[in-house]
Structure formats: structure tokens, C-alpha cells
Amino acid sequence: MPVVISLLNAMTGLSAAAAGLALNNTAMIVAGMIVGASGSILTNLMAKAMNRSIPAIVAGGFGGGGVAVSGGDDGDRTVKPTSAADAAIQMAYANQVIVVPGYGLAVAQAQHAVKDMATMLENKGVPVKYAIHPVAGRMPGHMNVLLAEADVEYDAMKEMDDINDEFGRTDVAIVIGANDVTNPAARNEPNSPIYGMPILNVDKARSVIVLKRSMNSGFAGIDNPLFYGEGTTMLFGDAKKSVSEVTEELKAL
């Protein structure tokens, strides 16, 4: 979705430039060319981040008939629910917490609640970082904008390539509304429609807490084996409410 939006932005710029040529309006030509060029560059960069060609993305290469892979043995497909209290205990005694935001965070408008939770953890001496996937959300830079709105420090927001090696050394990764960008099938399942797409290595963290409303699939339309992982627990409900409940439990510790 972010790639398509940036592509539409590029096409809008080119349309404005074409209109400027028709009207002999230099300002429209220059502005349209700038918007078109920037949109084209951004589209290309994001397509590379997904390891997909732009035509494949536009043609609906995701979720349009791919097999919903499980990424492992289908014999054990149960999820392990958790509570706000248990999640708070896990994070309060962690060596580090990595927050992985996704579109669900944007829908719930949970960025301020997440910032409050992170502040509480930092006051307890627990470092908090944010792992940002380049195509998380519904537009380019979506997660960066939301977190900046909540006054999250820029240095705490880490790009995928900068943070991926840290998951293996992290006690808790908390996934808030992210799905496809954390799906290990992209790394492990050659038959998956997202195979080869770079992902955040959330599954390598010692424990994972996933905040979701339900078990529905993400934009790619496939299941996520991460949710059934041995070290993964699920906290179901509205992300903002769940994060606020975790924060209240942290205050009591």
C-alpha cells in the first residue's frame, strides 16, 4: 500500500507537469517535475525494500492467490493469550524492549499511549527502542510521523537494517498492530507470496508480545507463523486500551 500511494504521488506530479506544459505555466511544470521525481525515487526505494518490482506490486502480487503458508508444523497452531499484568512484568524486568509499530497502531491512535508506556519503562531503567520497517503502515514514513507526533526521540527510532541485529539480544519485542513486516515466512518459506521480502527479525527476540484485535491476516492475506511461536504471547484488544492497561500495571510494580 505505501508503494502504491507514493507511485500515485509521482503520477500526480507528472500530471501537473503535463498540465503546465499545456497551459504554458512554468511554475506548474517545475513543481510537477519536482513532485514527480521525488515520488518516483521514493517508490523505487520502497519497492526495493520489499524486494519486489513496481509492476508486480501494482498488479497485486501480494495476496492475490498466494498460498497462506504456516511456516512450520501445522500440528501445533495454538496461540498463547496473555494479560496486561503479565506483559508488564515481562517488560519491567527486561534488558531491553523493542517496540514494533504497524498499521494497527495508527488505527487505534495509540502512539501517545505507547510513548507513556516507554517513558514508564525508561524510568525503571529499561531501554526502549522502536523498530521501523520502511513499508509499515499505509503511506511512506507513516510510523515515523505518528511516533514523532507523540514526541518520541528521533534517536530511539531505528530503521530495519540498524535494529535487526539487536532482536537476538533483546528480552522483549512488543508488536503493536504490525503483521506482514514481521512474518518469518518471508525468510523461511519459498512458497510464500512474500518470500524474499526483508522483514524485522522479531522472531529472534527472547520473547514476543503481540497486540492485535484478532487473528486476521495482514495486507498480504497470509498467516503469520510468528503468532504461534514458542516465545510469543498475544494480547488481544484495542491497541490503545491494551497499552494503557500495561502502563497502569507498570506503575504498580
Regions found by a protein language model. Give the residues of each.
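Hydrophobic alpha-helical transmembrane segments
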Residues: 18-23
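Short, non-helical or kinked segments that cap or interrupt transmembrane helices
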Residues: 1-14, 25-29
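Structured cytosolic domains appended to multi-pass membrane proteins
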Residues: 75-253
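Glycine/threonine-rich beta-strand-loop-alpha-helix active-site module
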Residues: 26, 30, 34, 192-195
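Membrane-embedded alpha-helical segments of transport systems
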Residues: 7-15, 38-42, 174
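Active-site nucleophile and cofactor-binding loops and adjacent substrate-binding regions
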Residues: 7-9, 34, 132
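Membrane-interfacial segments at transmembrane helix termini in multi-pass membrane proteins
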Residues: 30-94
